[in-house]
Amino acid sequence: IPAQYSAKNLEEKLVNKKELAERFGLTYSEKIPIIGLISRLYDSKGLDLVQKAFVDLMKMDIQVILLGTGDHKYHSFFEKMASKYPKKFASYLGFNDELAHLIEAGSDLFLMPSKYEPCGLNQMYSLTYGTVPVVRETGGLADTVIKFNEKTEEGNGFVFKKYDSDEMIKELKRALKLFEDKKTWQKIMRAGMKVDFSWDVSAKRYIELYKTILSSE
């Protein structure tokens, strides 16, 4: 990635955002949030929700960058949308590891509206990168993304429960409202960057889980 950054120097993340916008031919603005989406393009990944909500998404003051490959119907849909909304939406319909890293590091938010997701890695990457995830509450997403609570100011992302495009838009709007409050937003970013996904921690959790299961039998 163009610029390394940490929870202590979040400003450097903007260097990656600028590079990302330029790479995809979008006009860079610090104030306009970029929503990243890296996914296999299938219904199970919630792409039908994205398709259904697309016009509403394009009405928001955002830019969306998608990388992925999959179902032909989604390839043709996103190709059409990229030519219809060239200032707001860009896509790379294939896989490219370097671009995937740049999207993770340069986006402000990461969208993962999966129908089901046994584990999910992209939300973990995005948390580590300080790219705030907006996910559906399912499987591994529910385990790793904690819905931000405005009263307690705790949480590391945004979560919607019902598999529904309106619910997804509603939670996205809540995230975008908080994006305008830089202090709160950086708090959410830092909360995600502090999460430890190392195998050591995961292994300990599994061992505890097995002990619990065995002792209850």
Language model segments and positions:
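Catalytic cores of carbohydrate-active enzymes across secretory and cytosolic contexts
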Residues: I1-E217
